[in-house]
Amino acid sequence: MILVHTGNVLYPRFIVVAFTFEQRQGGRCKGGKATCMASVQSYKVTMQISSMTIIYPLFIFFSL
């Protein structure tokens, strides 16, 4: 139960952060749209990796 709860609490938070970052970036730069999209993509990948590194150790910790 703790496993599922922890995952459900953490993961949507990362998605929301990535989304708000993308919205902010889209509004800020009008000239270099391509560079903006690239930075947003790399940010999303970073968020996915960091969410995994936080959630998976918790899974291991709670399953011990």
UniProtKB/Swiss-Prot annotation:
This protein's superkingdom?
A: Eukaryota
* Full protein name: Uncharacterized protein YMR105W-A
